[in-house]
Amino acid sequence: MDSRKLGELRAFVRLCKQNPGLLHTEELGFLREWVESMGGTIPPAPASTSTDETSKGKAEEQPEEPVKSPEPESEESDLEIDNEGVIEPDNDDPQEMGDENVEVTEEMMDQANEKKMEAINALSEGDLQKAVNLFTDAIKLNPCLAILYAKRASVFVKLQKPNAAIRDCDRAIKINPDSAQTYKWRGKAHRLLGHWEEAAHDLALACKLDYDEDASAMLKEVQPRAQKIAEHRRKYERKREEKEIKERMERVKKAREEHERAQREEEARRQAGGAQFGGFPGGFPGGFPGAMPGGMPGMAGMPGLNEILSDPEVLAAMQDPEVMAAFQDVAQNPANMSKYQNNPKVMSLITKLSAKFGSKP
C-alpha cells in the first residue's frame, strides 16, 4: 500500500480517537457499519448530535458562519536545541581543488607525497595555515587522491572553517565514497554549523565503515539533538496530515450540502412551474373539463398529459401570459373561443392540444 495513504490513515485514526463524535457524521456511516459488523463498538454520540439533527432544517436556512481556522503554530515554538559550540558559517571563496582531468605522472605523485609530509609536519607544529597551503600544493599535483582532501578538511575544521571542510569532503567522497575519515570530518564540520541530523548521519557512517573513538564520542553528543529534531518534524507532519484530512472531510461535507441544496431548489422550481397551471387536471387552469368545441375527449382524466407537457412548443405557449389569460377565459366559458379566432398564438395552442387528443377545435 502507498506509504502516503498509510500515513493519512494513521492520522485519520488519531483524529477519530481524539474526537469520537466524527464517527457519527453521515459521511462516515459506512465506517460505523463496518466496525459494528466486525464486532466492534462505536462510542455513543455526543449529546449535541441529536440536537443538531432536530435543528437541521433551521440551520440550513441560516447562513453558515465562517469557520475560524486556528492560528498556525510556529514549527520552532516547542523545539529547543542546545546549540552550544555552534559557530557562524565561513564565507570565504572556495579553495583550490586542482584539475581533476590532469594526467598525473609518477614524478607528480612523488612531489605530492612530499608536500603531504611537509603539511603533516606543519600541522604537528600547530601551523595550521601553512598546513593548508602545503596540502593545497599536494592536491594540485595529484588532484585524484581522496586522502589529501580529507587531510585538508581536518585542518579547516580546526581553523573553524566548516564550509571549506565540507567542500573538501564532498570532493573526497566523489573520489572514494568508502573513506571513513572523510565522513568523520564532514560530520564534525556539520556539528560546528549546528546541522545535527547531517552530523549524526556522517558520524554514524564513519563509525560503520571504520570505528573511531573520536567520531563515536561526537556521535553520542549530536545524536540526541538529531533525534529531537526528527521527532519534532514527525509531529508537525502528523499535524499537517490531520489538517489535510479535516479539510478534505469539510470539502466533502460542503459539496454534499451544496448538492442537496441544488436538489431542493430544483424541486421547488418544478413545483412552482406546475402550480402555474391551476386546477386543470394535470395542471391546466380552471380544470378545462372537456368544454372546448369539438369535445376534446378524455380531458377529464388527461391520459396524454405527460406527452403534452413534454412538447417544448406547448410549454413555451404556457409561459406566455397572453396565451394563458385566453386559455383561462375559454376554460371558464367555452363560448369565448370566438374572441380568439384571429389570435394565432392562442389558436396554435388550441390546435396542437386538439391534435393531441384527436379532435378539431
Curated annotation (Swiss-Prot):
Classification via SMART domains: STI1, TPR
Keyword Phosphoprotein appears in the UniProt entry: no
TPR repeats: 112-145, 147-179, 181-213
Biased composition (Acidic residues): 72-98
GO BP annotation list: chaperone cofactor-dependent protein refolding
Compartments (UniProt record): Cytoplasm
UniProt region (Disordered), positions on chain: 39-98, 254-292
Main location: cytoplasm
InterPro entries: Hip_N, STI1/HOP_DP, STI1_HS-bd, TPR-like_helical_dom_sf, TPR_rpt
Compositionally biased spans, kind Gly residues: 275-292
Residue ranges constituting the STI1 domain according to the UniProt record: 311-350
Basic and acidic residues biased stretches: 53-71, 254-270
GO MF annotation: an example: protein dimerization activity
One Gene Ontology cellular component: cytoplasm
Keywords: Chaperone, Cytoplasm, Repeat, TPR repeat
Keyword Cytoplasm on entry: yes
Domain of life: Eukaryota
Subunit: Homotetramer. Interacts with HSC70 as well as DNAJ homologs and HSP90.
Function: One HIP oligomer binds the ATPase domains of at least two HSC70 molecules dependent on activation of the HSC70 ATPase by HSP40. Stabilizes the ADP state of HSC70 that has a high affinity for substrate protein. Through its own chaperone activity, it may contribute to the interaction of HSC70 with various target proteins.
Family: Belongs to the FAM10 family.
Entries under PANTHER family matching the protein: HSC70-INTERACTING PROTEIN (PTHR45883:SF2)
Name of the protein in question: Hsc70-interacting protein
Organism (species): Gallus gallus (Chicken)
Lineage: Eukaryota, Metazoa, Chordata, Craniata, Vertebrata
Name of encoding gene: ST13
